[in-house]
């Protein structure tokens, strides 16, 4: 198994040699990721004194909105090459990619051993770019851990990326032969094309080379026992245009679609035995969000078309079961009008709730409602037992996509300890 996998890796090493711009250093370099103590003159002084916090600053300062991840990917790849990691830049293509803009996942491992523990997060962010900045809390008597770091990606998910890398360096300092693999993917915020590219490649062999996968997302330092599933679709209505002064000469697509939207909007609150979407003790109710409606051309024209984008967070069941429920709801609400229907082919999203492992002591346990790359990574079975999957990271999802995205130094430092604990637990299962 290992020899075959090593051969696969060797064939992919088009960019695996050390980068000449960085001096070589041992894998086990001290990270100084532990909390600072004492007073400080400025927040910048604290960041500059810590290789870990400086690295986090550097990657947050690089704009990497989805489809524009190239520069931050190169920075991370160079950083890891300079620490003697073998680095593979795995090309990822997409329809939104501009000419000469290369996108790639960063896959890195520290030795010739087959990586058995995969540590992964994403390097893309949502728009718009928000510059890196620092703020201090004057009420905390110069406690460096309370310094607040703001900027796009400071939480989601460059906080996880930085903490994962430095946790891995901490582990490798004590155990240079630890079989770790680092994977930082593009496109998580726009459908997961980066993780799917890795999942479908020879870097994710069957049976799985990995007995443990550690995903990084903002979980407020809790270990996540699972997250809801996802289903995306459109509700479409077709009418006939006419002058608004003579509406009886046309058919309003908006009037036709409203009963369907009203019914679908309530499916998460309707019991399953009465035609609603299922709930579960673990995840609560399935939730429905009608996020966008596009209809008509002008107020004085009877609208000929209407379309609504819908996102469902599934608390139970499968996407196929949910599709059947939605179709029935639309049909019942419109008395079977064939010009109003649910369209699923235009949306690729669809996966059931994702249950995750929480068998490592010392963490709070929670569930989350947001989606991740967890379902985009196909887990191949192993002969020695199931592959464990963990989801953990610093920061709160409640600020992750907002203009107030921020994280404290203390949370970042605690995340390094948390990731290290998860890695060390995985090493004991070898």
UniProtKB/Swiss-Prot annotation:
It is found in: Secreted. It comes from the Eukaryota. Zn(2+) 2 binds at residue 156. PANTHER family: ACETYLORNITHINE DEACETYLASE (PTHR43808), PEPTIDASE M20 DIMERISATION DOMAIN-CONTAINING PROTEIN (PTHR43808:SF8). GO terms for biological process: proteolysis. Residues 1-16 form the signal peptide. GO terms for cellular component: extracellular region. Its main location: secreted. Glycans are attached at residues 84, 285. This is Probable carboxypeptidase AO090003000058. Its cofactor is Zn(2+). Zn(2+) 1 binds at residues 156, 189. Belongs to the peptidase M20A family. Its EC number is 3.4.17.-. Binds 2 Zn(2+) ions per subunit.
């Amino acid at each position: 198994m290992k020899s075959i996998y090593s051969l696969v890796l060797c064939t992919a090493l088009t960019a695996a040699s050390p980068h000449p711009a960085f001096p070589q250093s041992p894998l086990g370099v001290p990270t100084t990721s532990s909390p600072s103590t004492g007073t400080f003159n400025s927040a910048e002084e604290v960041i500059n004194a810590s290789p870990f916090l400086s690295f986090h600053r550097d990657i947050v300062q690089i704009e990497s909105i989805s489809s524009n991840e190239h520069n931050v990917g190169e920075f991370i790849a160079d950083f890891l090459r300079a620490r003697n990691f073998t680095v593979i830049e795995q090309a990822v293509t997409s329809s939104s990619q501009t000419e000469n803009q290369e996108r790639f996942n960063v896959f890195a491992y520290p030795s010739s051993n087959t990586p058995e523990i995969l540590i992964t997060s994403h390097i893309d962010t949502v728009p718009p770019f928000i510059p890196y900045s620092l703020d201090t809390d004057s009420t905390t008597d110069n406690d460096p851990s309370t310094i607040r770091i703001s900027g796009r990606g400071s939480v989601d998910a460059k906080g996880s990326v930085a903490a994962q890398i430095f946790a891995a360096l901490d582990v490798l300092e004590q155990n240079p032969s630890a079989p770790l693999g680092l994977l930082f993917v593009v496109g998580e915020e726009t459908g997961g094309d980066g993780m799917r590219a890795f999942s479908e490649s020879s870097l994710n062999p069957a049976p799985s080379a990995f007995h443990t996968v550690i995903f990084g997302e903002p979980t407020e330092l809790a270990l996540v026992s699972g997250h809801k599933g996802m289903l995306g679709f459109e509700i479409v209505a077709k009418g006939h245009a006419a002058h608004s002064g003579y509406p009886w000469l046309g058919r309003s697509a908006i009037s036709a679609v409203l009963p369907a939207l009203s019914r679908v909007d309530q499916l998460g609150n309707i019991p399953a035995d009465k035609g609603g979407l299922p709930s579960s003790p673990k995840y609560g109710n399935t939730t429905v969000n009608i996020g966008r409606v596009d209809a008509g051309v002008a107020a004085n024209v009877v609208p000929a078309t209407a379309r609504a984008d819908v996102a469902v967070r599934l608390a139970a069941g499968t996407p196929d079961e949910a599709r059947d429920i939605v179709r029935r709801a639309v049909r019942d609400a419109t008395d079977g009008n064939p010009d109003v229907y649910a369209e699923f082919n235009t949306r690729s999203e669809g996966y059931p709730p994702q249950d995750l492992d929480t068998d490592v002591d010392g963490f709070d346990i929670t569930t989350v409602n947001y989606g991740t790359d967890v379902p985009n990574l196909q887990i191949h079975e192993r002969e020695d037992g199931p592959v464990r999957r963990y989801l953990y990271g610093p920061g709160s999802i409640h600020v992750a996509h907002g203009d107030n995205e921020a994280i404290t130094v203390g949370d970042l430092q605690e995340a390094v300890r948390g990731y290290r604990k998860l890695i060390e637990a995985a090493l004991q299962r070898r």
